Curated annotation (Swiss-Prot):
A Pfam family of this chain: ASL_C2
Biological pathway: Amino-acid biosynthesis; L-arginine biosynthesis; L-arginine from L-ornithine and carbamoyl phosphate: step 3/3
Protein known as: Argininosuccinate lyase
Recorded superkingdom: Bacteria
InterPro entries referenced in this protein's UniProt entry, alphabetically: Arg_succ_lyase_C, Argininosuccinate_lyase, Fumarase/histidase_N, Fumarate_lyase_CS, Fumarate_lyase_fam, Fumarate_lyase_N, L-Aspartase-like
Subcellular location: Cytoplasm
A biological-process GO annotation: L-arginine biosynthetic process
The UniProt record lists the keyword Ribonucleoprotein: no
């Protein structure tokens, strides 16, 4: 049987909890990451207690000095949780009492509950975490942009259904991976508006009767506002679920980039060679160069999705207000951040060191009759209805396929035999360069458009960097 010594809640109980309950309740193995935030919030709380007349100036200063000492010891690792500590809050109260005594140290708990305390600390931690994750995502975007800038005219096969479809610029394709990642960063930045609401002062659920000032502590801790409803503030974790969704979306977007790299690095595609420092070998096959980073990105995306699903399942159908189920809210989010902090630098390094075989891509770009759409649209520009033009282009493909040649190899007579307006002039679009250059509308794959896209990606990235530094 455990004792209640050092517990934040033992007065009502004659005995301590059963050992199995104590083990089940323990959370210091994961919530210790909140310790620095707990110290900062406790200092703000001491100042609020002083302004409310609940501490003398001497008591306030003594608590602040003790918290400064405790914070330094937490930072350098000389103070940590004991086996007997239930959670980060109890461990830090123990540390504070060791430094300032039980009478003074015990005064800090006035006006706050672990319910509002942990909800506040979780938000503080998460607001910092999303900035670190966003920085990592922007590094991947920067690597994609650098590769796009290095290959402004390289042409590759564009695909739908993994089948050759139309020629596109490699830079266009790379930037197509950058845009969803930038939207993820936008989601993180937008999420911060909802995370920047402080639950502090809500108490267990009903608020405080001690004359505390939630707005003052919210401002001191860098929040935009204090919560409007104390029950909602202590019981809701939609902010955690929203963050977990964005983290999982980042994982999904990285997994699509990863899948492209995996395919491109195969012998069958042959688009890229992986740098030695960003790939691995085989313990039995000497020739292998494996895309482990990309494969781990695919795998970790599943883990991130699982963290989101698990968190949503935990939150489902909980009655108001706080329930102990919410002890399970942090580990999925902590894990998602930890996985992304491992993955994002590796993905940036992988992308930044890819060596593209532009000749191979250019050779494959027209194969599979990828210029057929250009034939149809060439006819449309000459007044032929698209339905008819589509049929004519399809007939040209069928004729070339029957002879085992490309569209460009059909004789002039064969072309006009398919459709009278399909003259020799169509050959101006029967090159991959002509095809790419013709797609000069906004968002298209023409070099002028892709250059604009690259500039926009870089400008947007920089705006996000500035915004996230605030």
């Amino acid at each position: 049987m455990s004792t209640n010594e050092g517990s934040l809640w033992g007065g009502r109980f004659a005995d301590g909890p059963a050992d199995a309950l104590a083990a089940l309740s323990k959370s210091t193995h994961f919530d210790w990451v909140l310790a620095p935030y707990d110290v900062v919030a406790s200092k703000a709380h001491a100042r609020v207690l002083f302004r409310a007349g609940l501490l003398t100036e001497e008591q306030r200063d003594g608590l602040l000095a003790g918290l400064d000492s405790l914070g330094s010891d937490v930072a350098d690792g000389s103070f940590g949780p004991l086996v007997s500590d239930e959670d980060v809050h109890g461990a830090l109260e123990r540390g504070l009492i060791d430094r300032v005594g039980a009478d003074l140290g015990g005064r800090l708990r006035a006006g706050r509950s672990r319910n509002d305390q942990v909800a506040t600390l979780f938000r503080l931690w998460l607001r910092d975490a999303i900035r670190r994750v966003a920085d990592g995502v922007l590094e991947v975007v920067a690597a994609l942009a650098t590769q796009a800038a290095a290959h402004p005219t390289a042409i590759m096969p564009g695909k739908t259904h993994l089948q050759s479809a139309q020629p596109v610029l490699l830079a266009h394709h790379l930037l197509a991976h950058a845009h969803p990642l930038l939207r993820d960063v936008d989601r993180l930045a937008d999420f911060d508006k909802r995370a920047a609401v402080s639950p502090y002062g809500s108490g267990a659920l009903a608020g405080s009767s001690l004359g505390l000032d939630p707005d003052a502590i919210a401002e001191e801790l860098g929040f935009a506002a204090a919560a409007d409803n104390s029950i909602d503030a202590t019981a809701s974790r939609d902010f955690a679920a929203e963050a977990a969704f964005v983290f999982s979306m980042i994982g999904v977007d990285l997994s699509r980039l990863a899948e492209d790299i995996i395919l491109w690095s195969t012998t069958e595609f042959g688009y890229v060679t992986l740098h030695d420092a960003w790939s691995t070998g085989s313990s039995i096959m000497p020739q292998k160069k494996n895309p482990d980073i990309a494969e781990l990105a695919r795998g970790k995306s599943g883990r991130l999705i699982g963290n989101l699903a698990g968190l949503l399942a935990t939150l489902k159908a909980q009655p108001l207000a706080y329930n102990r189920d919410l002890q399970e809210d942090k580990e999925p989010v902590f894990d998602s951040v930890a996985q992304l902090e491992l993955l994002l630098p590796a993905m940036a390094g992988l992308v930044g060191t890819l060596r593209f075989d532009v000749d191979r891509m250019a050779e494959l770009a027209p194969l599979g009759y990828t210029l057929a759409t250009d034939v149809a649209e060439w006819l449309v520009r000459r007044g032929v209805p698209f339905r008819v033009a589509h049929e004519a282009a399809g007939a040209a493909v069928r004729a070339a396929e029957a002879r085992g040649i490309g569209l460009e190899d059909l004789a002039d007579a064969e072309l006009t035999g398919i459709h009278p307006q399909l003259t020799a002039d169509v050959r101006e679009v029967l090159t991959t360069e002509g095809s790419v250059n013709s797609r000069d509308a906004r968002g298209g794959t023409a070099p002028t458009q892709v250059a604009r896209q690259l500039s926009a990606v870089r400008d947007t990235s920089e705006r996000f960097r500035v915004r996230l530094r605030r």
